[in-house]
């Protein structure tokens, strides 16, 4: 203690003595509003500082402090729990809104008289009344936007639920597994702190008890679970990294047995490399996804605690890279050495077998009575939400609600229907546009936006974008699509939409034009000169501070302009907005992520870090050859079975085709899409492909190739085949009786006849079952061509009837498995450790089972295709 005191400043010593006196006197300093707001601003991203006012954060902090005072569990919360898991408004990368200030009284009343534990369960029921799962794009909706539309993907459901928990003073955090190891997808859920410990729950998916969710089984096979804690957090969890804004912690140890993985990086001469990037990668969606990237320490090492499964490693430094594999056969600490033995021009061709963690299950306990009562509550909550969503615009009432007689009425009605809960805002915008003879332009602008944009953007934002946008100039007059997509469109990248044109014009116009009139650009040279001035202003006036936006939030153009500081991506967003404001078509290229502007019908890469503001990249082309093998796919899909990445400086950058219109390939890119030459920047590329087996194991392949300027490169896509033929893995009783949807009980065999048949037992509305239903719907033509019987079972008569509406075909029969007899027979016959629904099995009339899938499996369709091809 005395040694420590010697090194303290007078201020630190005074603070320490004051704190000691307070503790000894039995009182603790209560956090004030200024303390709370100061804490938020100390660790807040610069994106939030530019996009939201201090009054906004002050109002939210007031409610957080109020909850701590008024809720009965507030006294249980120490400052650490409160500051990091109640006070912060931000959960993920969502747009921040007034949810907390608007719903505090509502939620406080909802949990009145409940214990902290029961209040957490009750809040989740309230969330389920408001929001249910629906897939959507990567931009995260705000809590109020999710409520407005009654839906959200898992990242939005968990953001919404964390916001609701924090509103009533329950510490909560969003937990992500960045990618599953045994199937293609990821997932996010919620952890809550009640009565002294953290527990998990499925967001907007209430169960009768904590630590119960449909993902108990998948979570047991996870490799990594992490959460970003606001501020500099010093808790008991394993810390992955600390940044200026957050502390990333690893909570995998709360769920499964773990091991420590140690990667040592060396150069080609055997010397250790410090400061190298080490990507701990999980195969998922056709790529080696970097779940965590760490820097090597002074010993050339980086370490990470994970589940016990294979993990691919990509390390890079100084323009060189190397790879390695952490194996499942090491249940304890696992160490490997990765040598940086490749550069961008040295080719790589490797096959990798990747095993996920073994199946298991996280224990969950609840009585049958509690489960039954919970199901009744879920049904009632569904009815409340459906009653609300029934008020949305549909094909029947769209024309009446629109109230416009115009040649564009059909297009306007479609937008009104797509707007879901936001239909009033979209109607107001279209009526306003029509009144000002701008309806056609307004509809074209709406077409440039995503469905999510249509569903959460206010009329005033859209109207400002329409009337403030630059008019077409010589570049865009003769190509309306260029004008609509890259000048009129207010969406730049992933930022939330907010007016920006007038703020940018008023700030930059004096710099660009001086005291002269603003003239229309009429020549390519004039356009290039104008673009150079905008780029030059951006370079001089917007400071890049990536470390102050460690969450990679995408700031609005107006927010960046206000504080003149941004991360590099937000600076690009501002620059594109500025170029569009002055009529220069510009974009952030969906595929490569490069900022570009157009002049003379060419896209120019903007180079902010070089002396020249832009140049045209050298281009080449590639084609892809693919020959299906026995049991492999006829036409593998991009971002499910294979991906392409550009390698530059030893690092990989995934080529993104998800935007649909971003490339000539479109959103549904597949192997056949590459049969004709496809244009790419010249350089080195990596083709990654993988065949996922029923066990979750992946047969992966990685090969590099070079695209040269003005030349075509043909690359072979190989989907590796399992050397194991389809084999019998279990038994079932084809003479077993089942209850058809109509009529008396009868045997399975009497329905299927001789030969192979498919059996599917679904849950009622759970996420894994919904995924499986969509997979089977996507295979409807292939299953019809296969021509064999399919038996589909629901949990009740109503559930089975709903399934018939979704999956009916000439070869499909429907039954009821309310007592789980069919499910148990299939799982027990294969000695399956789990019986989680849905259960999908391929069987034959001799009682043999050759395929079984239980629970969450986003690779179901591709696995069934392989099984059908192999039998």
Predicted regions and their residues:
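Secondary-structure boundary elements
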Residues: 29-149, 381-563, 610
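Hydrophobic/aromatic-rich core segments of domains that either
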Residues: 109-114, 119-125, 134-144, 152-241, ...
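Short, ordered, surface-exposed loop/turn motifs in non-cytosolic proteins
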Residues: 268-287, 309-310, 530, 630-660
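Short, acidic Ser/Thr/Gly-rich low-complexity loop/linker segments typical of extracellular
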Residues: 284-305, 651-674
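Structured interaction patches on ligand/partner-binding surfaces of diverse proteins
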Residues: 319-343, 693-720
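Short active-site neighborhood of thiol/selenol oxidoreductases, capturing the structured segment around
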Residues: 748-772, 776
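Short, internal strand/loop/helix patches
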Residues: 803-837
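A short, hydrophobic beta-strand/beta-hairpin element that forms part of a small beta-sheet core
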Residues: 836-854
């Amino acid at each position: 203690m005395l040694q420590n005191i010697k090194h303290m400043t007078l201020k630190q010593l005074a603070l320490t003595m004051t704190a000691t006196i307070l503790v000894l006197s039995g009182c603790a300093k209560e956090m004030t509003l200024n303390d709370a707001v100061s804490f938020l601003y100390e660790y807040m991203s610069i994106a939030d500082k530019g996009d939201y006012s201090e009054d906004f954060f002050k109002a939210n902090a007031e409610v957080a402090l109020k909850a701590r005072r008024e809720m009965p569990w507030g006294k249980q919360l120490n400052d650490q729990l409160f500051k990091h898991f109640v006070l912060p408004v931000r959960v993920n990368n969502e747009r921040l809104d007034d949810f907390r200030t608007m719903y505090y009284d509502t939620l406080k009343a909802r949990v009145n008289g409940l214990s902290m534990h029961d209040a957490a369960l009750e809040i989740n029921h309230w969330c389920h009344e408001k929001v249910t799962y629906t897939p959507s794009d990567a931009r995260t909706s705000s809590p109020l936007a999710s409520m407005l539309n009654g839906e959200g993907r898992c990242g939005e459901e968990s953001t919404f639920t964390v916001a609701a928990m924090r509103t009533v003073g329950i510490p909560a955090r969003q937990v992500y597994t960045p990618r599953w190891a045994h199937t293609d997808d990821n997932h996010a859920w919620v952890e809550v702190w009640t009565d002294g410990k953290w527990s998990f729950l499925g967001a907007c998916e209430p169960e009768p008890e904590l630590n119960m969710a449909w993902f108990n089984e998948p979570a047991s096979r996870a490799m990594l679970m992490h959460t970003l804690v606001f501020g500099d957090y010093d808790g008991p969890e394993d810390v992955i990294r600390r940044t200026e804004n957050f502390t990333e912690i690893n909570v995998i140890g709360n769920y499964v047995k773990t091991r420590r993985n140690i990667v040592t990086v060396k150069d080609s001469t055997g010397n250790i490399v410090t400061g190298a990037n080490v990507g701990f990668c999980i195969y998922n969606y056709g790529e080696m996804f970097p779940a965590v990237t760490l820097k090597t320490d002074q010993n050339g090492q980086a370490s990470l605690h994970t589940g016990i499964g294979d993990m691919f490693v990509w390390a890079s430094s100084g323009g060189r890279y190397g790879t390695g594999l952490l194996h499942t056969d090491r249940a304890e600490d696992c160490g490997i050495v990765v040598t940086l033995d490749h550069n961008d021009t040295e080719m790589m061709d490797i096959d990798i077998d990747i095993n996920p963690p073994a199946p298991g299950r996280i224990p969950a306990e609840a009585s049958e009575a509690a489960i039954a009562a919970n199901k009744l509550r879920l049904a009632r909550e569904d009815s409340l939400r459906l009653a609300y969503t029934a008020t949305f615009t549909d094909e029947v009432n769209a024309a009446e609600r629109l109230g416009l007689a115009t040649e564009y009425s059909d297009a306007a009605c479609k937008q009104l229907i797509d707007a879901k809960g936001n239909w009033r805002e979209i109607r107001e915008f279209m009526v306003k546009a029509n009144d000002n003879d701008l309806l056609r332009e307004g509809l074209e602008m709406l077409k440039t936006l995503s469905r999510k944009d249509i569903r959460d953007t206010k009329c005033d934002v859209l109207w400002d974008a329409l009337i403030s946008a630059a008019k077409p100039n010589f570049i865009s007059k003769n190509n309306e699509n260029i004008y609509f997509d890259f000048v009129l469109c207010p969406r730049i990248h992933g930022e939330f939409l907010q007016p920006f044109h007038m703020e940018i014009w008023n700030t930059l116009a004096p710099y660009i034009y001086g005291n002269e009139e603003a003239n229309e650009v009429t020549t390519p040279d004039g356009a290039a000169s104008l673009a150079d001035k905008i780029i030059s202003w951006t370079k001089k006036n917007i400071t890049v501070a990536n470390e102050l936006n460690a969450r990679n939030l995408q700031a609005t153009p107006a927010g960046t302009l206000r504080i003149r500081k941004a991360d590099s991506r937000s600076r690009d967003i501002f620059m594109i907005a500025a170029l569009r404001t002055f009529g220069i078509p510009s974009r952030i290229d969906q595929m490569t992520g490069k900022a570009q502007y157009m002049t003379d019908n060419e896209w120019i890469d903007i180079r902010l870090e070089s002396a020249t503001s832009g140049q045209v990249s050298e281009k080449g082309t590639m084609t892809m050859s693919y020959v299906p093998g026995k049991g492999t796919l006829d036409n593998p899909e991009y971002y499910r079975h294979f991906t392409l990445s550009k390698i530059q400086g030893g690092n990989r950058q995934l080529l993104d085709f998800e935007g649909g219109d971003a490339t000539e390939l479109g959103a549904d890119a597949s192997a056949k899409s590459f049969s004709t030459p496809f244009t790419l920047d010249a350089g080195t590329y990596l083709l990654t492909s993988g065949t996922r087996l029923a066990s979750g194991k992946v047969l992966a392949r990685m090969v590099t190739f070079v695209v040269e300027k003005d030349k075509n490169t043909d690359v072979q896509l190989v989907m590796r085949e399992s050397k194991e033929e389809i084999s019998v893995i279990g038994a079932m009783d084809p003479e077993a009786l089942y209850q058809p949807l109509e009529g008396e009980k009868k045997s399975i065999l009497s329905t299927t006849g001789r030969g192979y048949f498919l059996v599917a037992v679904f849950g009622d509305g759970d996420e894994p079952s919904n995924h499986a239903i969509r997979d089977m719907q996507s295979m409807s033509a292939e299953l019809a061509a296969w021509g064999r019987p399919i038996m589909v079972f629901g949990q009740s008569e109503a559930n089975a009837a709903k399934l018939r509406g979704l999956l009916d075909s000439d070869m499909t029969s429907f039954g009821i498995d309310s007592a789980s007899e069919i499910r148990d027979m299939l799982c027990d016959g294969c000695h399956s450790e789990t019986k989680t629904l849905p259960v999908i099995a391929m069987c034959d009339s001799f009682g043999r089972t050759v395929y079984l899938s239980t629970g969450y499996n986003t690779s179901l369709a591709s696995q069934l295709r392989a099984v059908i091809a192999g039998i």
